[in-house]
Design a protein with these regions (language model features):
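PRPP-associated nucleotide enzymes
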Residues: 1-166
């Protein structure tokens, strides 16, 4: 039997995103920032984080999302017909610090794929990473700039994130 445990409820997620928004604004003071969510749940979190950052700055910042289906290094070992979403990056990356947003950081392979996909659209001034949960167990030298919750897990455990789309 698999044991299920809620680690962050909706209020916790909201408070965590508010904190991360403050950190993003503080760390990037005076520099143009754009948020890019990694499909699927990262895109929902990026939308929520975007609104908070815009409210703090009292201005609009670019928001996009990126699909990494064809950039994954396990593409051949997954389903033969990967689910592909359109990426939406309607701004020049070169002008911005791009904050990649994802739900859970685990091995780092998703982030590696997202960075590769991002650079196919241009060369950002810098790239930062914001995650709701960091599980550890990295296989690549990837470290988040903004972490909602450090969540040590066994490799055999799963972390499921359920977020309401805004």
């Amino acid at each position: 039997m698999t044991e299920s445990k809620v680690v962050l409820d909706e209020d916790d997620i909201r408070r965590t995103l508010v904190r991360i928004a403050h950190e993003v604004v503080e760390k990037n003071s005076g520099r143009p920032v754009a948020l890019v969510g990694i499909h699927r749940r990262g895109a929902h979190l990026a939308t929520r984080l975007h609104q908070l950052v815009c409210d703090l700055l009292d201005e609009q910042v670019p928001l996009g999302d990126i699909d990494i289906a064809f950039y994954r290094d396990d593409l051949n070992t997954r389903r033969p017909d990967p689910h592909v979403n359109a990426s939406n990056l309607n701004f020049r990356l070169e002008d911005y610090t791009v904050v990649l947003v994802d739900d859970v950081l685990y091995t780092g392979r998703t982030v590696r794929a997202a960075i590769e996909a991002l650079f196919d659209y241009g060369r950002p001034a810098r790239v930062q990473l914001a995650v709701l949960a960091d599980r550890g167990h990295r296989e690549l030298p990837i470290r988040p700039d903004y972490v909602g919750k450090n969540l040590p897990t066994a490799r055999s455990e799963r972390v499921n994130v359920r977020v309401e789309a805004s």
